[in-house]
Amino acid sequence: MSGPTLLKESGPREVFCGLTSIVWLHRRMPDAFFLVVGSRTCAHLIQSAAGVMIFAEPRFGTAILNERDLAGLADAQEELDRVAKELLQRRPEIRTLFLVGSCPSEVIKLDLSRAAERLTDELQGRVRVVNYSGSGIETTFTQGEDGALAALIPFLPSSDERQLLLVGTLADAVEDRLVHLFNKLNINAIKSLPPRQSTDLPAVGPGTTVLLTQPYLTTTARLLKDRGARVLTAPFPLGAEGSRRWMETAARDFEVDEAQIDSVLSPLMERAQIALAPHREVLKGKRIFLLPESQLELPLARFLQRECGMELVEVGTPYLNRDQMAEEIALLPEGTPVMEGQHVELQLDRVRDSKPDLVVCGMGLANPLEAEGIATKWSIELVFSPIHGIDQAGELAELFSRPLRRHQLLAH
């Protein structure tokens, strides 16, 4: 069978933990609060990643587990109840409280699901309390969002209404633009998960067609199928081609006429080609190595190879759901090494041996590689940037052309 070469490896990994997803989730749902049950290290990570000043009133915090908790000398459940109740008393605007597990809370087997049920009962429905794990022991950082959305699914109302459900966090402006385009295709019943208010949960049922906006929502997709929804398989909306195919998949499911699809999307594709042109000049023929971290690697590789002319040395991904990623896999060049999992030392050896022009990697690896003269791109920046949709193709390409330009300037 032709197509990329699918490989696997395991060993030491270099990734952020799932707590990082709180940074974009708390911006999406301003009436929700994310209470991490973890260590001071967890608190420092979230504070630094979010860039919030210490005097601000952010919508996240950390219930610190100290030495007595970790040694089992204190009742951590009792202390957690006290912290949560004090928080809700001080912040009456909170409507959903997420209790977020961490590596320390999982090591001591702290049962956050029991705490969430107990607090929900005591608060008598005034605040919904849910829990999920943001631990990095077995997961990568984007899976924090998958856990948070999966925790909300039992609370979604049931409905047989014919509707399109966009699943995965997008920047508000990007989502508004995509909804506007779907409206022009006569798809008007559109809901989002996560919603912009945590209490405005979408209904789901046999009439629901799910279109994933992010490739890392495997558990969420499975649970939505269990609720009767149908999950479409499509390339993800990164780059002009992927975004068009993504929208076409939904439009055909809603039986939109091909001529109407073309009339709405073709002008956008023409503009995208103009926006891509200056970046393609920089990227064409350059060799790129994508280390596994965000699970965006396959859609990005497809975009960079097919629309920007880059050569793929290796495409790493933390996990590969072959069913969900089937359309992306089919669009990659024959023989491209796609490596699921990570042995970071072996991958770094392959980076040094292959001498790529650009490496997409985590922040912890970027500086050492830059010191060796290899241009890098932080993978986490791709998660925080508004890169989805045909309109954003030029901005997405610029995220890769910029480090190459900078590297060339420094070299001269």
Curated annotation (Swiss-Prot):
One of its GO terms (biological process) is light-independent chlorophyll biosynthetic process. InterPro entries: LIPOR_BchN/ChlN, Nase/OxRdtase_comp1, Protochl_reductN. Gene3D superfamilies: Nitrogenase molybdenum iron protein domain. It catalyses: chlorophyllide a + oxidized 2[4Fe-4S]-[ferredoxin] + 2 ADP + 2 phosphate = protochlorophyllide a + reduced 2[4Fe-4S]-[ferredoxin] + 2 ATP + 2 H2O. Pathway: Porphyrin-containing compound metabolism; chlorophyll biosynthesis (light-independent). Keywords: 4Fe-4S, ATP-binding, Chlorophyll biosynthesis, Iron, Iron-sulfur, Metal-binding, Nucleotide-binding, Oxidoreductase, Photosynthesis. It holds the Pfam family Oxidored_nitro. The keyword Nucleotide-binding applies. Disulfide bonds: none annotated. [4Fe-4S] cluster binds at C17, C42, C103. It comes from the Bacteria. Its cofactor is [4Fe-4S] cluster. Its EC number is 1.3.7.7. Binds 1 [4Fe-4S] cluster per heterodimer. The cluster is bound at the heterodimer interface by residues from both subunits. Belongs to the BchN/ChlN family. Protochlorophyllide reductase is composed of three subunits; ChlL, ChlN and ChlB. Forms a heterotetramer of two ChlB and two ChlN subunits. PANTHER family: LIGHT-INDEPENDENT PROTOCHLOROPHYLLIDE REDUCTASE SUBUNIT N. Component of the dark-operative protochlorophyllide reductase (DPOR) that uses Mg-ATP and reduced ferredoxin to reduce ring D of protochlorophyllide (Pchlide) to form chlorophyllide a (Chlide). This reaction is light-independent. The NB-protein (ChlN-ChlB) is the catalytic component of the complex. This is Light-independent protochlorophyllide reductase subunit N. It comes from Synechococcus sp. (strain CC9902). The lineage of its organism: Bacteria, Bacillati, Cyanobacteriota, Cyanophyceae, Synechococcales.
